[in-house]
């Protein structure tokens, strides 16, 4: 119901914006993302016509191709995707950004695995291993991972921890976007979250198995046990905390407007 109301409000605001603005500028963002919320709710974009796209990568492609005038994407994504030395050298961030937020890993509601992973995140941060991984992708300045949480205690019934340990794998739902999860020139899966997840799994003593999923189907995939966690640069929100078990925050983020450099 919340999602339906939110979508209705978004549509209403977009109609209002379209009525008030005379510009034909096109704004794009990933469907059902934090970027879409900014596009729908922020008055800075009242003169834009908004169009949803499948992925953040597609949003940047549209701006680069000239089929859109601006995109709203994660600041984290922009670090590895635009500017000098990237495929989108002609794209830049316009302004200071919107919607300060934090990333977390999502597990099934009530999962005892969350507390165990929280312990490992803090250990990796304290040892410096997580910082070193972040430095490889120029993300160390926005790294978190120090927050306290409940101590791990294995559940007596329906233990996700036991389930994962018995099968020896942690199936991780991902989407592809640099610098979090992407393929290098050799076709190997790399990225901050890829290395981070492997480090956590090494501490758990299980194999990290990465499975690409659709952003819009992430909750369904998790509930159906097609994946064991959602690890895709996911913003922590009250609604998600109500429906899933979320790890401690591991990275700061914000939404930014990306345009072609002048």
Regions flagged by a language model, labelled:
Residues 25-89, 93, 111, 256-262:
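Pocket-lining segment of extracytoplasmic ligand-binding domains
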Residues 36-51, 90, 94, 121-162:
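Ligand-binding clefts/hinges and TM-proximal coupling segments of bilobed small-molecule sensing domains
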Residues 1-9:
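Positively charged n-region of N-terminal signal peptides that target proteins for export
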Residues 25, 29-32, 82-99, 198, ...:
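Acidic, polar ligand-binding/catalytic clefts
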Residues 16-19:
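C-terminal motif of bacterial Sec signal peptides marking the signal peptidase cleavage site
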């Amino acid at each position: 119901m919340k999602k339906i109301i939110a979508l209705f409000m978004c549509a209403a605001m977009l109609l209002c914006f379209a009525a008030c603005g005379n510009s034909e500028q096109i704004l794009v963002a990933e469907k059902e993302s934090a970027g879409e919320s900014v596009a729908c709710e922020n008055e800075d974009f009242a003169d834009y016509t908004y169009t949803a796209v499948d992925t953040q990568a597609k949003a940047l492609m549209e701006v680069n191709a000239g089929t859109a005038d601006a995109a709203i994407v994660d600041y984290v994504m922009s670090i590895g995707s635009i500017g000098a030395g990237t495929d989108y050298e002609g794209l830049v961030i316009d302004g200071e950004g919107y919607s300060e937020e934090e990333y977390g890993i999502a597990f099934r509601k009530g999962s005892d695995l969350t507390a165990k992973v929280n312990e490992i995140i803090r250990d990796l941060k304290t040892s410096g291993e997580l910082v070193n991984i972040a430095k490889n992708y120029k993300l160390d300045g926005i790294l978190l991972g120090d927050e306290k949480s409940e101590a791990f205690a294995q559940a007596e019934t329906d233990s996700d921890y036991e389930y994962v340990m018995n099968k020896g794998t942690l199936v991780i739902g991902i989407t592809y976007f640099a610098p979090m999860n992407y393929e290098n020139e050799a076709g190997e899966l790399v990225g901050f979250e890829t290395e981070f997840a492997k480090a956590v799994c090494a501490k758990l003593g299980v194999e990290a198995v990465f499975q690409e999923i659709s952003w819009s189907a992430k909750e369904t995939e998790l509930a159906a046990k097609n994946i064991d966690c959602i690890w895709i640069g996911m913003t922590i929100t009250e609604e998600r905390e109500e429906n899933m078990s979320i790890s401690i925050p591991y990275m700061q983020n914000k939404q930014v407007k990306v345009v072609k450099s002048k």
